[in-house]
Amino acid sequence: MENKQYTTRELFRRFAPYFKKYRFTLCMDLFCAALTTVCELVLPLIMRYITNEGLRDLAALSVKTIFTLGILYFGLRIVDCIAGYYISDMGHVMGAKIETDMRRDAYNHLQKLSNTYYNNTKVGQIMGRITNDLFDVTEFAHHCPEEFFIAGIKTVISFVILANINLPLTLMIFLCVPLMCGVCMILNFRMRSAFRKQRNQIGELNARIEDSLLGHKVVKAFTNEEVENEKFEKDNGTFLDIKKLTYRYMAAFNTTVKLFDGLMYLVVLVAGGIFMVRGKIAAGDLVAYMLYVSTLIATIRRIIEFAEQFQRGMTGIERFLQIVDADIEIFDEPDAVELKDPKGEISFEKVSFEYPDDHNKVFTNLNLQIHAGEKVAIVGPSGGGKTTLCNLIPRFYDVSEGKILLDGQDIKRFTLKSLRGNIGIVQQDVYLFSGTIYENISYGRPGASKEDVIEAAKRAGAHDFIMELKDGYDTYVGERGVKLSGGQKQRISIARVFLKNPPIIILDEATSALDNESEFAVAKSLGELSEGRTTLTIAHRLSSIRNSDRILVLTDDGIVEEGDHDQLMEQKGIYYQFYETANALK
């Protein structure tokens, strides 16, 4: 995963459109924020009036006036509470909705990314980006516009009122603000860098834990618990070091703010006292001045405290953008059409291919014709490109040169959904989703009737063993199907393809990991599955492909032998050597 870095301006520009759907809520949130701010700024004015009037002529200050001011302030407090409730409720809901929208966009984009992306990216990193990182965006989306809006209002109004009370003193106070902001911006930049490292390390830690837990059987089999603990401790220790650095920057940040807080209070205390002694500011004005300065400093402190949340949110947005900006390498052409009822005739015309991260060509000018309904087996040494060849047909990868035709048309002319919808794949490493057997079979055709699911299971030879289970089709298979045997999982995956009912079948070493009994049952199911369909079979067990219409021997030099079993045995070439070696091992 490319860890591209974005400027703050670019992050705001990319994030802002997510507020578009919630403009009314945002405007109401800011309006309520303005109300709470105004309510808060009225109290010092009331205190100023009472103090000045009391010192000027205590007898003129009636109880009625004080009660009137008290009722006014109480009314403003009620307004403040109602506005605050809206901010806390609807404002946070808006943030949660934006987080949900971003997570949806990230997940939808991940669905479109090619195998190359997943080959080069740790799942733990991806999980961290679409879960933990976006949690911080909820608070950021709510508080960021609100906090800066409130700060802007309070700063402007406070400056106007303070300047009206005593301009020289106000200028002294506000001279401290640019200096404080400059220092804080430097520390903010360092905090952002630390938070970025922290998030990356969390992803590495998640990937380490996931890898170890998924491979727990291998860990136990090799008694390597201590080795895994050492790896974990190393990654965990790195995370701690990064977090220490983050807290160090945060401590420096908070200390700087407190220092400037004290400096501003000191200016008011000393300069304000001198102005009062010289009669340039009234006592009531100085009281109000202190209250407004306290409000101003509290606002600045609130923004400073928000800085940590701000940096977390910006880091979360940045890591989100690194997902949605990942290039989609396999996509529909602008004029792509739906593939309907294909016959299944496949042609490779001068196909060359190399993986994006490896410049060594797997194929060079490969030509191959597969007739509709033909059963073709592909054998050869490991690393010869058998699986790669089959992965090119459903466009899990695109050819580097040449083209692949389906029924005489370039496969790129068809939409990915319709192309892959007409191809069924049974792999050696069966992946079952966490859920029931019924849910896993119906994955082949979502929305299929129960009768169709059961019929697919019967044709795959899975129905009998399913019914022997306590919960039948409602049996929970566990994560990746761990509660089932290899043969059972394979037959469920075959049932899934039966339900899909595609005209083209790819069998990628579908029986190589099974015992003899399971292989016999699965081979029978595969035989029925391939009947009447264009079938490509990759196999190491040559006994499973003897009845293929045609067998191809694929090596680094391309297709070096071709024919049925008897023809290849007569040639006494590579296939003959493979077959004799397999028999000798038996």
Regions found by a protein language model. Give the residues of each.
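An intracellular "coupling" helix at the cytosolic face of ABC transporter transmembrane type-1 domains
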Residues: 24, 115-116, 132-141, 145, ...
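Hydrophobic alpha-helical transmembrane segments of ABC transporter permease domains
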Residues: 31, 35, 39, 43, ...
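Transmembrane helix-loop-helix hairpins at lipid-water interfaces of multipass membrane proteins
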Residues: 26-86, 163-168, 279-283
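ABC-type nucleotide-binding domain
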Residues: 332, 339-586
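Alpha-helical transmembrane segments of multi-pass membrane proteins
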Residues: 31-32, 76-95, 146-153, 174-198, ...
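Short intracellular "coupling" helices and adjacent cytoplasmic loop segments at the cytosolic face
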Residues: 2-5, 96, 104-128, 132-134, ...
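Juxtamembrane loop-to-helix connectors within ABC transporter transmembrane domains
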Residues: 11, 19, 87, 91-95, ...
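Helix-loop-helix
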Residues: 56-68, 161-175, 245, 249-318, ...
